């Protein structure tokens, strides 16, 4: 009997999910992307070669894994085909092992133009999107006007819908944002080319997944971004436009909740965030700079520097509750090597001195909150590439043990470097 495992980020994304998914695919036959778009990059380093995947599931680097892009993903055909060709240039046969849902909403050039125009228009109040059209594409989906992958294969219907949509969006672009219009004829021509390339890879993903399940195959669901970028449960409005929590697997892949066996939450040994929004444990001093430099904290897709701070157990506790997380994987422990003192936020304090054990639900409610820290001694020895728990420095083990105690959940995996083998597995999700 196969197992169905979900891997998701418990913070603001960039937790190192790509490497862990790649590692776990040694035990999986199927890997599924179920939400988001090409706004988040999963970085893998195998035999010293770095690969950044944006849309294609990380399992593609394993030769016997079938990969699916499910209906919860907003799909840029241009970005996907570019990524496919990049991987094919490295000798990876993508098209035989990649399947795409007919129900994926399309990201088209007018979505990207709208995204960038809005961010520019908002100035200092901008959310800090990646400018890749994700939000506008999800808006079209919710407004029930989106063009989907399946529409590409009905030329006349697609052309009629595209004409209507472009008329609507071009009005906003030209009249409100004072930006150039997107050309209909050139977009229609591109779309016909995309249709021919995508046609062999499309299917009813939900139906395929249930066939894999019935055959007893292991299925791995690969989340993008992190819990606190969730449109409902994140630090709204500084969030993404999709649901990033485990419930998104059910809707975004058409996979029933009782079929999920294990949820692995990925967290860094510290905290990072890209773009605007609250960040209670953010470090603006030399320690924060040191963590950023050692951790090479720059966005895989945008190259933007990430904000860095101490481990926030208040946020993690809520992530665990929201996602019924079975176990944690802590990444980038080696980045903390050499620090004299480490801090874990165990609560927040408001301006009146009241102690809060849970995070607020809205971004503005984080204003004036200060973290309440617990201090632990650091370690001077290297944890890089350690593969046995007992070989870690005593203070590193104590730090991890304290995280387990505070959160009330086991650390099942530990990443000590970017390579596949730089991992300690205490309990494998597929076991």
Curated annotation (Swiss-Prot):
Gene3D superfamilies recorded for this chain? Adenylosuccinate Synthetase, subunit A, domain 1, Adenylosuccinate Synthetase, subunit A, domain 2, Adenylosuccinate Synthetase, subunit A, domain 3
Localisation per UniProt entry: Cytoplasm
What is the name of the protein in this document? Answer: Adenylosuccinate synthetase
Q: What residues does substrate bind to?
A: 300-306
Q: Cofactor stoichiometry and binding?
A: Binds 1 Mg(2+) ion per subunit.
Active site location: 14 (proton acceptor), 42 (proton donor)
Please give an example of a GO cellular component term from this record: cytoplasm
Query: EC class of this enzyme?
Result: ligase
Subunit record text: Homodimer.
- Purpose of the protein: Plays an important role in the de novo pathway of purine nucleotide biosynthesis. Catalyzes the first committed step in the biosynthesis of AMP from IMP.
**Which catalysed reactions does the entry list for this protein?**
IMP + L-aspartate + GTP = N(6)-(1,2-dicarboxyethyl)-AMP + GDP + phosphate + 2 H(+)
- UniProt similarity note: Belongs to the adenylosuccinate synthetase family.
Question: For this protein, what is any one GO molecular function term?
Answer: magnesium ion binding
Q: Where exactly are the transmembrane stretches of this chain?
A: none
């Amino acid at each position: 009997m196969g197992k169905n495992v979900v891997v998701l980020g418990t913070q603001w994304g960039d937790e190192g999910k790509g490497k862990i998914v790649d590692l776990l695919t040694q035990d999986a036959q199927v890997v599924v992307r179920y939400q988001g778009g090409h706004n988040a990059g999963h970085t893998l380093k195998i035999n010293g070669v770095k690969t950044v995947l944006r849309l294609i599931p990380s399992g593609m680097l394993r030769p016997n894994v079938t990969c699916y892009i499910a209906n919860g993903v907003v799909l840029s055909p241009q970005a996907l085909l570019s990524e496919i060709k990049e991987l094919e240039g490295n000798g990876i046969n993508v098209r035989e092992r990649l399947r795409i849902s007919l129900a994926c909403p399309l990201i088209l050039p007018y979505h990207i133009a709208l995204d960038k125009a809005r961010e520019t228009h908002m100035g200092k109040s901008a959310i800090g999107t990646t400018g890749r059209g994700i939000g506008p594409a999800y808006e079209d989906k919710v407004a029930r006007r989106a063009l989907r992958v399946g529409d590409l294969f009905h030329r006349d219907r697609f052309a009629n819908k595209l004409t209507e949509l472009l008329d609507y969006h071009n009005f906003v672009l030209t009249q409100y944002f004072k930006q150039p219009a997107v050309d209909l004829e050139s977009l229609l021509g591109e779309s016909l080319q995309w249709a021919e390339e995508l046609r062999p890879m499309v299917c009813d993903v939900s139906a395929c997944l249930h066939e894999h399940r019935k055959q007893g195959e292991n299925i791995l669901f690969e989340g993008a971004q992190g819990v606190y970028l969730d449109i409902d449960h994140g630090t709204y409005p500084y969030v993404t436009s999709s649901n990033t929590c485990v419930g998104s697997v059910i809707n975004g892949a058409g996979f029933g909740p009782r079929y999920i066996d294990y949820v692995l939450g990925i967290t860094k040994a510290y905290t990072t965030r890209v773009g605007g929004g609250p960040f209670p444990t953010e470090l603006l001093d030399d320690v924060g700079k040191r963590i950023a430099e050692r951790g090479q904290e720059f966005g895989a897709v945008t190259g933007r520097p990430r904000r860095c701070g101490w481990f926030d157990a208040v946020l993690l506790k809520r992530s665990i509750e929201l996602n019924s997380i079975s176990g944690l994987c802590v990444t980038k422990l080696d980045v903390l090597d050499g620090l004299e003192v480490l801090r874990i936020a165990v609560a927040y304090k408001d301006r009146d001195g009241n102690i809060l054990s849970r995070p607020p639900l809205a971004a503005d409610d984080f204003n004036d909150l200060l973290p309440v820290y617990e201090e632990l001694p650091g370690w001077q020895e290297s944890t890089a590439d350690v593969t046995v728990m007992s070989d870690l420095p005593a203070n590193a083990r104590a730090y991890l043990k304290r995280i387990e105690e505070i959160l009330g959940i086991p650390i099942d995996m530990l990443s000590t470097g970017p390579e596949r083998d730089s991992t300690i597995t205490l309990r494998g999700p597929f076991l």
